[in-house]
Swiss-Prot record:
Name this polypeptide is given: SUMO-activating enzyme subunit 1
Keyword Nucleus (UniProt): yes
BP term (GO), one: protein sumoylation
Pathway: Protein modification; protein sumoylation
Quaternary state and interactors: Heterodimer of sae1 and uba2/sae2. The heterodimer corresponds to the two domains that are encoded on a single polypeptide chain in ubiquitin-activating enzyme E1. Interacts with ube2i.
Native source organism of the sequence: Xenopus laevis (African clawed frog)
Family in the record: Belongs to the ubiquitin-activating E1 family.
InterPro entries: ThiF/MoeB/HesA, ThiF_NAD_FAD-bd, Ubiquitin-activating_enz, UBQ/SUMO-activ_enz_E1-like
Highest taxon listed in the record's lineage: Eukaryota
Gene3D superfamilies on file: NAD(P)-binding Rossmann-like Domain (3.40.50.720)
Subcellular location: Nucleus
């Protein structure tokens, strides 16, 4: 993790971030203004995360993507101007990203992340990967966990989206309303029976939480008695994520509308194989699940990108309890759920 320089907020920055400073405090904003973030994958979800971090006021954001702009990107990637087909996605996103907040340093990196050394990641406070295969996610997460770098990953598949966080051993503060005790003069009166909570007076409470690596969260032994007892409470989107990540690993891409019939059949086969290998019922996912997993839908990107951006801001500012460790969103029902999976 990079060494933090002394944070100073100028008058111009104080005016720019006035609303945020009122929300989470000057010290939290100072932490953001000294933070460097790596964002990998500039598709629709990546664009949403980039927007939220730039507007929040991090010090520097690096957009890393070696892929070229495709027609599919026009569905949800609002940072890429029309007429950019064939250009590098990170470079095509750069101008609009910088215009969101000139106070944030935004750079593009067009190199393939697979060719980055372990040392490359140590210059960042947060590393966030989107639209990446599981083996790459596990590798980068291992590097980040080793060097105490906050790690996030997120994906959107059609109506479904998810995010995962590994913050290692994370300390933060929560703002709580101050409870005042009854005065001795009225301890025998009716007021003594009431706990007085003054919402206008608050205190900061320090807390600590431990996160597990992504590998542990993905490799749960669902045949164990402990896991079986938790299965009914586990969101089915966790298993859907496993299926879609296996598809990405096998095909080197996500399900595409242009090959809908072929990909739907393959998803059903992969689903059967994955659920069987995990030791869970083949009926865990509905038979029509494949119909809702194609393309990045802009509204789902907005929701998941909003949550992902919010969690990164919370992790950097050390304010408020983080989501530990998964967040799943179902666009069909407009429901989101946080669940902790894989922790000991």
């Amino acid at each position: 993790m990079v060494e933090k320089e002394e944070a100073v907020i100028s008058e111009e920055e104080a005016a720019q971030y006035d609303r945020q400073i009122r929300l989470w405090g000057l010290e939290a904003q100072k932490r953001l203004r000294t933070s460097r973030v790596l964002l990998v994958g500039m598709r629709g979800l990546g664009a949403e995360v980039a927007k939220n971090l730039i507007l929040a006021g991090v010090k520097a954001l690096t957009l890393l993507d070696h892929e070229q702009v495709s027609s599919e990107d026009s569905r949800a990637q609002f940072l890429i101007p029309s007429g950019s087909l064939g250009q590098n996605r990170a470079e095509a996103s750069l101008n609009r990203a910088r215009n969101l907040n000139p106070m944030v340093s935004v750079e593009a990196d067009t190199e393939n992340i697979n060719q980055k050394s372990d040392d490359f990641f140590t210059q960042f406070d947060v590393v966030c990967l989107t639209s990446c295969p599981s083996d790459l996610l596990v590798r980068v997460n291992h590097i980040c966990h080793k060097h105490n770098i906050k790690f996030f990953t997120g994906d959107v598949y059609g109506y479904h989206g998810s995010m995962f966080a590994d913050l290692g051993e994370h300390e933060f503060v929560e703002e709580k309303a101050k409870v005042t005790k009854a005065k001795p003069l009225v301890e025998d009166g009716p007021e003594a029976k009431k706990a007085k909570i003054d919402p206008t007076e608050t205190i900061l409470v320090k807390k600590k939480v431990q996160f597990c690596p992504l590998k542990d969260a993905l490799e749960i032994d669902w045949r164990s008695e402990k896991a079986k007892s938790a299965l009914k409470k586990t969101p089915t989107d966790y298993f859907l994520l496993q299926v879609l990540m296996k598809f990405r690993t096998d095909k080197g891409r996500d399900p595409q509308p242009s090959s809908y019939q072929e990909d739907s059949e393959l998803l059903l086969q992969i689903c059967s194989d994955v659920l069987d290998s995990l030791g869970v019922s083949p009926d865990l996912l509905p038979k029509d699940f494949a119909s809702y997993c194609f393309s990045e839908m802009a509204p789902v990107c907005a929701v998941v990108g909003g949550v992902l951006g919010q969690e990164i801001v919370k992790a950097l500012s050390l304010r408020d309890a983080p989501h530990n460790n998964f967040f799943f969103f179902d666009g069909k029902t407009s429901n989101g759920i946080v669940d902790c999976l894989g922790s000991k």
